[in-house]
Amino acid sequence: MEALRTEERAVRDWWGRLGLPGLVDIHTHFLPPPVMAKVRAQFDAAGPLIGRPWPLHYRDTDDVLVETLRSFGVARFTALAYAHKPGMADWLNQWAAEFADRVPEALVCGTFFPEESAAAYVAARLDTIEVFKIHVQVGNFSPLDLLLDETWGLVAEAGTPVVIHAGSGPVPAAYTGPGPVGELLSRHPRLRLVIAHLGAPEYAEFLALAESHERVHLDTTMAFTDFFSEMGGVFPAELSPRLRDLGLGGKVLLGSDFPNIPYPYLHQLESLRRLELGDDWLRAVAHDNARALLGPPKTM
């Protein structure tokens, strides 16, 4: 408990020194308890889509984890869920809506999966969902699947951000990589995508997509951390000037993967600071860019 209190003070000091009112984290996970239990079991077993031991640093009930984020001063965060089989997505969307109802700081999140009903259940919730999440690796589907074409069109028209895990880390899968995402954007150029993990390990290619598409953003989830670097996700130093420009241009957002991380939350923040891209960049990434993308918070 004392270690957590020390971390709370350090996290608040991190953003307080920047003159920020708190943090906005675009990439956190809250799931129905049976689903979260299965996710944790995969991490504990270092499952095939993980590729290495992954000792979870935070493991508790939703109520405790929400209070942890509040104690850190995370003013807004997501409850990202993702479907890995048909018939699952809308159930997750209902659960996420109920979670956001009882947690004022939580953005209303949703997901979808290539299935005949996708466009209908997305359309039914499009007025309320604030962020979607798609996991190409875990879902093992192509974002170009024709069953999703109408859904992508609806989401593009609405302008709702979609956090998409499409990079080939930590373990590549059949449909990961920048190619399918580039083709998706050629079909739906108005899509507002947030590339999870900066697209690791295909950093250069995904940075290029953000540079060439007005509505494509990147999140920092696990990037630059010691753990990620040990997995082969070292961010190339020569890309730092481009990363700086994208961050100052509103395109890079703080993400953490909390609570499913194998190190303290503070380490993600310290990893950003040691890039030495400047306080203006840190302010933009940790708060201002997400605030601009998401709009004002709901009344609490």
Label every model-predicted segment.
Residues A3-T6, V131, F141-L253:
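Catalytic pocket-lining loop regions of alpha/beta-barrel enzymes
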Residues L20-G22, G73-F77, R102-V108, D127-E130, ...:
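Short, well-ordered coil/turn segments that N-cap beta-strands
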Residues H27, L69, A96, R125, ...:
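Conserved, mostly hydrophobic/aromatic
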Residues H29-P34, H84-G87, E115-S117, S168-A174, ...:
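Active-site environment of divalent metal-dependent phosphoester hydrolases
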Residues R5, A75-R76, H84-T176:
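Active-site gating/metal-coordination segments in enzymes
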Residues T28-F30, A81, G110-P114, I134-V136, ...:
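A cross-domain feature marking catalytic cores of carbohydrate-active enzymes
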Residues V64-T68, L92-F99, A120-R125, L147-T151, ...:
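A general structural detector for well-ordered alpha-helical segments in enzyme core domains, enriched
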Residues M1-I26, P33-R76, L248-L253, P262-M300:
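Mid-to-C-terminal alpha-helical segments outside catalytic/metal-binding sites
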